[in-house]
Structures are given as C-alpha cells and as structure tokens.
C-alpha cells in the first residue's frame, strides 16, 4: 500500500484505500471501485492517487476531462494506452493526464504525437512520473507569458508550453496550502 494523505477528502478510510491498492496491484483495472476512486481523485485534482494506483498496477493510466467535467479513464501497457472513444463528451477537453509509472515525467514521442493531434481540442496536459508532475498549457486556449519554453519551435507543438517538473513534495505542499485556504474561505 502507498500512504496517501487526506484520504477523507476522497471519502475513503485507510481500510478502503488498502482494498483499492490491492485491486491495482492485482491489475483489476476494470473494477468499478477502483475506477470510481480514480474518477473522484481526478475530479479533485488528486494526481497523487491516480499516479499511485498506476504505479501499483505497473500500467499507464490516461485521464481525459471534457468541457463539462466528465471524466474518462483508460489503462494500458507502458507506451501504449488505447483511448476508448468517450461517448457524449464535449470538446474542448479541459485536461489530458497520463502516467509514466516509475519513470520520469517527460513528453515522449507518443505523448508529443498526441499533443500535436489534440492541439485544437485539448487545453492542458499533465504527465505524472516518479519525480512529480510535468504540465503543458496550450496557447490556443489561454494567454501565456512572453518567455515560455515550448515543446517545439515549429508546428502544432509550438502551441504547447514545456514547463518544469513540480516535485511531489512541492505539489503536496501546494495541496496542503489550498486545503487550508478552502477552510478559511
């Protein structure tokens, strides 16, 4: 089991989290319980949970969130997650998240092909890896600062920022800060 803070935010007890971890370790990735936890975690931006389950299963996970906050979850072997057509989903997609379990967070050639193909329908993308979270924002959907690094200087990847990895420790600190602010407001 991987220790996850603030399980109550997910509506889970330690025992329930242990059971979900067992499902992931056993690669029971179509389990409604596991998928429900992933959807809840995704809706709360709890990428630590999504990454941990992916790491335990030894499989990559892809999360797609549409313009109406519908969430689609797909699983696959490293380097190959076949996305199921999310019926009834509305573009543009707010976010595409995928994992590199046990490896660094980087934009692989498969990832950059997906970003290039999705450059007119995906607003933001994250890759979750062992050191943390790597984010990219699509300039077609937001105003960026002047000196942002891009994934490429040419073609559709020129629309996508190439941002530094945010380490898990730093990410947890921002999660804790946001939780404190929510309690104040």
Protein language model regions, located:
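Conserved beta-strand-loop surface patch within small alpha/beta domains used
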Residues: 1-95, 102-185
């Amino acid at each position: 089991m991987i220790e996850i803070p603030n399980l109550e935010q997910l509506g889970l007890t330690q025992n329930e989290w242990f059971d979900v971890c067992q499902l992931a370790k056993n690669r029971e990735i179509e389990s409604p319980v596991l998928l429900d936890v992933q959807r809840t975690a995704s809706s709360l931006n709890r990428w630590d949970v999504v990454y941990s389950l992916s790491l335990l299963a030894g499989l990559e996970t892809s999360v797609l969130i549409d313009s109406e906050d519908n969430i689609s979850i797909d699983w696959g072997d490293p380097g190959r997650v076949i996305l199921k057509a999310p019926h009834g989903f509305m573009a543009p997609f707010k976010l595409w998240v995928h994992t590199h379990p046990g490896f660094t967070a980087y934009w692989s050639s498969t990832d950059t092909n997906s970003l290039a193909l999705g450059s007119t329908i995906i607003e933001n993308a994250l890759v979750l890896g062992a050191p943390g979270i790597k984010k990219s924002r699509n300039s077609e959907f937001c105003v960026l600062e002047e000196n942002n690094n891009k994934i490429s200087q040419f073609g559709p990847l020129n629309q996508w920022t190439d941002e530094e990895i945010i380490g898990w420790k730093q990410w947890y600190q921002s999660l804790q800060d946001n939780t404190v602010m929510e309690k104040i407001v």
